[in-house]
Amino acid sequence: MAAPKQAARKPRRRDRKSVPVGQAHIKSTFNNTIISITDPSGAVVSWASGGDVGFKGSRKSTPYAAGMAAESAARKAMEHGVKKVDVFVKGPGSGRETAIRSLQSAGLEVGSITDVTPQAHNGVRPPKRRRV
């Protein structure tokens, strides 16, 4: 029986490309806030969320968690050379404004802020009202 062939694999090193201008996509839901920083073509450079930075359960939906997530994503993006971002905000959550402020305070220059929240043209039925 022939011995299995071992292919000599050299370690793949991912080349870190420099992206001076990017886009920050902030998706803020009622349960969490997700920040993705991409290059102009849409390829993700860095991302972070409320759960990613260590919050669990209902704490993920707080503005503080959104700010921490935005700061974390900004730091990772700045390692790739991102200096300026255009911000696209989606969703009704509480962490929208805090995330934008945290991107600025982390050292990223915010060029424009655009709200891209989808509007339903009588699409799906909304969730029922909460009775507490």
From Swiss-Prot:
Sequence similarity: Belongs to the universal ribosomal protein uS11 family.
Pfam families documented for this protein: Ribosomal_S11
Sequence segments annotated as region (Disordered): 1-24
HAMAP family (alphabetical): Ribosomal_uS11
Compositional bias ranges of the Basic residues kind: 7-16
One GO term (biological process): translation
Keywords: Ribonucleoprotein, Ribosomal protein, RNA-binding, rRNA-binding
Name of protein: Small ribosomal subunit protein uS11
GO cellular component: ribonucleoprotein complex; ribosome
Primary role: Located on the platform of the 30S subunit, it bridges several disparate RNA helices of the 16S rRNA. Forms part of the Shine-Dalgarno cleft in the 70S ribosome.
Assembly and binders: Part of the 30S ribosomal subunit. Interacts with proteins S7 and S18. Binds to IF-3.
Cited PROSITE patterns: RIBOSOMAL_S11
Lineage: superkingdom: Bacteria
Single Gene Ontology MF annotation: rRNA binding
